[in-house]
Amino acid sequence: KNLGRELDEPVTALGFVASCTVSEDGVADVHLRLPTYFCAPNFAFLMVADAYEAVSAVAGVRRAAIVLDDHFASDAINEGVAARAGFVESFDGLAAAELDDLRADFIRKAVLAGTDRVCRPLLAAGRTTDDLAAMTLGEVPASGDRERLRERRAELGLPCSDDSPLLVDAVTGAAIGVQALPLHLRKARLTRVGAEANSGICRGMLRDRYAGAGVGAVHDPNSDALNDAMNDSTPAPARVEEHA
């Protein structure tokens, strides 16, 4: 599975895959796209490099050709990924460091957002914050969100077994205590809301930029509301002052 790391969603679901073909001799040709011409080059490089790794690992693929279209840094990114050069070499003189730290930051945010997705149903079902602080991952009802959280924690080397605490610090892996739990849950919620808002905005902008839905795109109704709000030119109603 190839993810748009900043949004923690598959690039297919986001609509970022413009086309994908595999020749009879095992050459996979994938064209990627982004919502704007000026999307951050570090994010774009991560996406293309991760796509190269994911496609190359598919059984039967002899060679992967991953191309980012319509981006101001397309040439540098495409040539760098094809040559297996890193970000610094691909942007010689412009980049100071590789993207490992950035990737880890994105995954930590995904852990926080995933924590909210797992904990909200538990709280809605009557669990208390004290309950959450004492729970393990294995005690959470099985769900796609739980396994997604487990996967992100594993990527960072954080505790992720059934016996691991449900709530851990996304940097240190230490269990979150009862006193720190309210703040931790607020941060998790804000991170999840921010990620979903960014995802909706990206989908809306991509839809405005390209007519086709993309290979494997999944429609998100939230993006419709966000896009309508951004494009709404109706002036806000004037404030009515009341006088005694």
Residue ranges of model-derived segments:
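Domain-level signature for proteins that mediate thiol-based redox and metal-cofactor handling
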Residues: K1-Y37, N42-A244
